[in-house]
């Protein structure tokens, strides 16, 4: 191979590596945008301002809560309530308990999903901890609030008539660990 073809190959490989790194950082925002636009994957609606509904529905719905932690994240993460029964339009506050089981400060982030997927568009989050980095110090335990309601139009949608239970599921993933010695950070 000539020096010119070696240079071309090196630049091509470098470009490929840079593209892969950039794509990996952009994948979560791109996925979030895709889910928000298409409603795919049980993505919920999100209120930008806390709107407290004055009119409530009549059909009770059970909301179950699920919590998962990636194997690389030494946290305990559980819902404080296993389930609640609400009616559409009823604002609801629940908590998830999170505990860092390690000797190091760790930053994690969570993603969520609502099942059945077709009902996700009616699940409106007013406040939650998802998609935001959460720092838990070594051995720290915190309560993380989620405020939500089911849109009143849920009752009017014929496709929702058979749904009596929704599940809100969160999964936490490790972003990075901060070593116990100051100034030393693991990435």
UniProtKB/Swiss-Prot annotation:
Residues 31-187 are periplasmic. The keyword Transmembrane helix applies. Keywords: Cell inner membrane, Cell membrane, Copper, Membrane, Signal-anchor, Transmembrane, Transmembrane helix. It holds the Pfam family CtaG_Cox11. Residues 1-9 are cytoplasmic. It is found in: Cell inner membrane. The keyword Transmembrane applies. This is Cytochrome c oxidase assembly protein CtaG. It comes from Rickettsia felis (strain ATCC VR-1525 / URRWXCal2).
């Amino acid at each position: 191979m000539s020096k010119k073809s070696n240079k071309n190959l090196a630049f091509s490989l470098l470009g490929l590596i840079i593209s892969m790194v950039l794509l990996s950082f952009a994948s979560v925002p791109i996925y979030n945008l895709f889910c928000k636009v298409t409603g795919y994957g049980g993505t919920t609606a999100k209120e930008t301002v806390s709107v407290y509904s004055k009119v409530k529905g009549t059909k009770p719905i059970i909301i179950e809560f699920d919590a998962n932690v990636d194997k690389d994240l030494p946290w305990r993460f559980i819902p404080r309530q296993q389930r609640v029964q609400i009616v559409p339009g009823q604002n609801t506050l629940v908590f998830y308990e999170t505990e860092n089981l390690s000797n190091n400060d760790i930053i994690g982030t969570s993603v969520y999903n609502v099942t059945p997927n077709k009902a996700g568009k009616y699940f409106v989050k007013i406040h939650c901890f998802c998609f935001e980095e959460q720092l838990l110090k070594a051995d720290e335990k915190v309560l993380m609030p989620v405020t939500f309601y089911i849109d009143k139009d849920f009752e009017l949608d014929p496709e929702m008539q058979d749904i009596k239970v929704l599940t809100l599921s969160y999964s936490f993933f490790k972003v990075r660990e901060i070593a116990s010695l100051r100034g030393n950070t693991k990435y």
